[in-house]
Amino acid sequence: RGQKVNHKKVQRIMKELGLKCLVRMKKYKSYKGAVGEIASNILDRQFTAEAPNEKWTTDISEFKLFGEKLYLSPVLDMFNGEIITYTIGSRPTFSLVSDMLEKALERLPEDHKLLMHSDQGWHYQMKQYRHALKARGVVQSMSRKGNCHDNSVMENFFGIMKSEFLYLKEFESVEQFKEELEKYMNYYNTKRIKAKLKMSPVQYRTQFTQAA
């Protein structure tokens, strides 16, 4: 039978042997039944937006490296595909999502009408999460149970991230993975040309803002 070893020891041994680690990514199943309040699917697969900060969506993805799990919680603007912010942690706690939401709402202009979409994960059903949205006048929307296509925008982002970032790199440590992830998020927002926009998400938002 295998022995459980601390991920830092695994990192040290792999470094001594000159080995690097590939990352595995999979969908995190956060649905635990009706633990709070489930919102209607107001978004209804209307994934386009006329302006920034009209429709945001969020989800959680799970990574595995050096025998340890990491959880990523990003929020994406459907107007231009920009990642507004993200949090990453070793456990899928409520604070992973609440910290993400707090950071995201700091970027939302006052009295701005926003629709925030997610799946029916337990984090998004919690009273604290719903109250944080309500306090800023944000309307909550949820996918139908077990229907990933209702949040395909976020699924598409995770797919791009897999092919462009995770499967092309090897990592020496969890810390290096986090550093490279931050670089990739910046690249994705500011440099990567989105075919539909013919420019990067930030360039598209900047152009729209200047023209308005």
Describe each region flagged by the PLM.
Residues 64, 87-109:
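Active-site beta-loop-alpha junctions of metal-dependent nucleic acid enzymes
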Residues 10, 14, 21, 43, ...:
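Mobile genetic element proteins and their domesticated derivatives, centered on retroelements
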Residues 1-51, 147, 202-209:
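Basic, flexible linker segments flanking DNA-binding modules
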Residues 110-126, 144, 148, 199-201:
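Acidic/histidine-rich, metal-coordinating catalytic segments
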Residues 45, 49-84, 90-91:
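An active-site-proximal beta-strand-loop segment
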Residues 2-3, 47-49, 65-66, 120, ...:
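Conserved, non-catalytic sequence blocks in retroelement Pol enzymes and Pol-derived host proteins
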Residues 127, 134-138, 160-212:
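C-terminal domain-tail junction helix/linker
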Residues 23-29, 116-120, 134-153, 169-173:
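RNase H-like polynucleotidyl transferase catalytic core
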